[in-house]
Amino acid sequence: MENYLIDNLDRGILEALMGNARTAYAELAKQFGVSPGTIHVRVEKMKQAGIITGARIDVSPKQLGYDVGCFIGIILKSAKDYPSALAKLESLDEVTEAYYTTGHYSIFIKVMCRSIDALQHVLINKIQTIDEIQSTETLIVLQNPIMRTIKP
């Protein structure tokens, strides 16, 4: 079912669940004028097709004490170092996202820390000690005015 094409009902279901993943199928069924069974079948088909990959709860890092967010561009010593560098970065709790990119940086990561001092510790004692990394550039996040996912 890899080439499942979504229709307007699927789009509506996705938008509703992206807004609140805990919305009951019965409520969605009423909203779209179909049976709860239809909603269930559609959701299962989208799961099998890899369109729906899970449900999650969003938390506020700031409310949990993470006051410093940053993006770090990483230049590797060699392209062949990517798998091992990525494995080491993945082991760091402060690294919340990683991207393999084109352009100046080989890897771009998002890091969350409780303070500037904590960020400095992560940079000096964790990230910059990874042998495969040649250099880094850190961009501190001042605001996150737009945060959304794609529309189905």
Swiss-Prot record:
GO terms for molecular function: DNA-binding transcription factor activity; identical protein binding; sequence-specific DNA binding. Residues 6-67 form the HTH asnC-type domain. Keywords: Activator, DNA-binding, Transcription, Transcription regulation. It holds the Pfam family AsnC_trans_reg. One of its GO terms (biological process) is response to amino acid. Residues 25-44 bind DNA. NCBIfam families: PRK11179.1. This is Regulatory protein AsnC. It comes from Escherichia coli (strain K12). The lineage of its organism: Bacteria, Pseudomonadati, Pseudomonadota, Gammaproteobacteria, Enterobacterales.
